[in-house]
Amino acid sequence: MKKKYRFLKIIFVAGIWIFLLRFSLQRFNNRPVEDIVVKMLQKEPVSFINDKIVREIIRRENPTNRIGDLNILSLERAIRAMPMVDSANVYLKLNGQLNLDIIQRIPIFRLSKNDKYFYVDEKGVDFPMSSSYSYPCMLVSGKVDPEEYPMLVELVKIINRDDFSKNFFVGISKKGNDYYLMTNEGNYVVELGRLENLGFKIKGFKTFVEKYLIYQDQMKYSKISGITA
């Protein structure tokens, strides 16, 4: 008899717990999404998207604004689908707080190709420019193949790491199969040729400028070969 009583007691208590759990879950699901925390976690400050844009996407994905109607995976896919977003993590805490951790793409260079402008990030991924925000970076022009993006990323990083190069070179241009560096002095361009041995070429040209070119009339040059400089 005792065992039977104990068994009935366990069933009763379990039933109460299930009822309370279902009741609490129903109340939780009926709550509105009020506490939203958006974090931009990229290593440099960029503003292609902001808190307002993210909240508009949340409203579009969850028009009822009920926690129970919120599809976390669908919302995360919508954020990740934005071309300027590198990655996104969306999660809901037990207290009902909706969290969005977003990493935006950081442009390495700006590409002018076929009368269109794009940004290219450090992974070699291109994405459209923004009408409301501009990020300062090197301009690259010409018929550049996507396969060349990684080497151009390396070239721009080499230039940006050196104060002389960063201040001296203002753009990169592709003509035919060869690349040229635009300078802020004189009327000349620096011929790089193919995208290979980039560090050696940039260092060689810098040495050429410091030991020879600064003592010359730079206006008389139209092209200087960085291949042999």
Task: List each language-model region with its residue ranges.
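Charged, solvent-exposed interaction patches on well-folded alpha/beta domains
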Residues: 1-39, 45-66, 70-81, 86-229
